[in-house]
Amino acid sequence: MKLLYLFLAILLAIEEPVISGKRHILRCMGNSGICRASCKKNEQPYLYCRNYQSCCLQSYMRISISGKEEDTDWSYEKQWPRLP
């Protein structure tokens, strides 16, 4: 019986449960990017994630440095064609 309690105590002491299958995907840049060790060929690395991996964004993503929408030639309406 003591062995059972010892086993349960060790099992509960484990920080992360063991999960089979896919690993949890760590998102970055407001869920626009994915943290990876190396970016895919259609992605661009931008800054770093908490785990010191690159934050990979799709090549078409635009990042606003000022934090607000600017009315410039790079605005969303002027960048993409309108769909009928």
Curated annotation (Swiss-Prot):
Cleaved signal peptide residues: 1-21
InterPro entries referenced in this protein's UniProt entry, alphabetically: Defensin_big_dom
Localization per Swiss-Prot or TrEMBL: Secreted
Gene Ontology annotations of biological process type: defense response to Gram-negative bacterium; defense response to Gram-positive bacterium
Disulfide bond positions: 28-55, 35-49, 39-56
Chain segments annotated as transmembrane: none
Family: Belongs to the beta-defensin family.
Record protein name field: Beta-defensin 119
Organism for this UniProt entry: Gorilla gorilla gorilla (Western lowland gorilla)
Top-level taxonomy: Eukaryota, Metazoa, Chordata, Craniata, Vertebrata
